[in-house]
A protein has these predicted regions:
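Short acidic (Asp/Glu) patches
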Residues: 66-72
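A generic structural signal for short coil/turn motifs at secondary-structure boundaries
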Residues: 49, 73, 144-145
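Short amphipathic alpha-helical leader/targeting segments
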Residues: 57-58, 73, 150
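All-alpha amphipathic helical-bundle segments outside canonical DNA-binding/catalytic cores
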Residues: 124, 140-153
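Residues immediately flanking
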Residues: 42, 66, 88-90
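A hydrophobic/aromatic-rich effector-binding and dimerization subdomain
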Residues: 2-18, 73-141
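Generic protein-terminus/edge-of-domain signal
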Residues: 1-61, 68, 100-117
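Short, solvent-exposed loop/helix junctions and linker helices
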Residues: 31-34, 123-126, 152
Length: 153
C-alpha cells in the first residue's frame, strides 16, 4: 500500500485485449499484508480464495484477510473486468469499529467459514454502495488539507 492506513481503487481492464502469447491468467495468485474488500462490478470471472472458487456476479463483495491467497480466474470471453478494491490496515479497521460493530470480526469469520468470503449486495443497494465507494476514491484523489479528514470520516 502506498498510504499506510488504506487505499481504494476503481479498476477497469479489457481482459480480451491481452495478447494470446501472454499467460492466460494476467493476475497471478497473491496475498497482501493488509485486509482487502473487493467489490465486483463486471466481467466473466471466478475468484479463487484459499482453495475455494467463487463464481462472481455483479454486486458481489469479497472479504480477504491478510496473507490469504487469492486470484481472479478469467473465463472465456471475460470482456471488461471492473471492480473496486479497498485495502485497509488492521489498525485502521479496528479504529473504525465501535461497541456495536467490529469490522475485524467480519474478516475473522472468513477464516472459519469457507462461504463467508462472499457476500451478495442486493441489486437495489448496489448503486448506492458504488456511489459511496467512488466518492471515497474522488476524495482521496483530491489533494487539499481536508481530503484526509473527509476520507477518514
Amino acid at each position: 500500500m502506498k498510504h499506510s492506513e488504506f487505499e481504494i481503487h476503481h479498476r477497469r481492464d479489457d481482459i480480451n485485449s491481452y495478447h494470446p502469447s501472454q499467460e492466460k491468467q494476467p493476475i497471478q495468485l497473491h496475498h497482501h499484508d493488509f485486509y482487502e474488500v473487493y467489490y465486483f462490478i463486471s466481467g466473466n470471472v471466478d475468484y479463487l480464495v484459499e482453495n475455494k472458487t467463487y463464481h462472481l456476479h455483479p454486486g458481489d463483495l469479497l472479504l480477504m484477510s491478510p496473507l490469504e491467497l487469492h486470484q481472479p480466474v478469467f473465463r472465456e470471453d471475460s470482456g471488461i473486468y471492473e471492480r473496486i478494491v479497498l485495502w485497509i490496515d488492521g489498525k485502521k479497521l479496528s479504529e473504525l469499529s465501535n461497541s456495536e460493530i467490529s469490522f475485524l470480526s467480519c474478516f475473522k469469520q472468513t477464516q472459519s467459514d469457507t462461504e463467508a468470503h462472499l457476500y451478495h449486495i442486493r441489486e437495489e443497494k448496489q448503486k448506492t454502495l458504488q456511489y459511496f465507494l467512488d466518492e471515497l476514491i474522488s476524495t482521496m484523489q483530491t489533494e487539499n488539507q481536508y481530503s484526509a479528514l473527509i476520507a477518514n470520516s
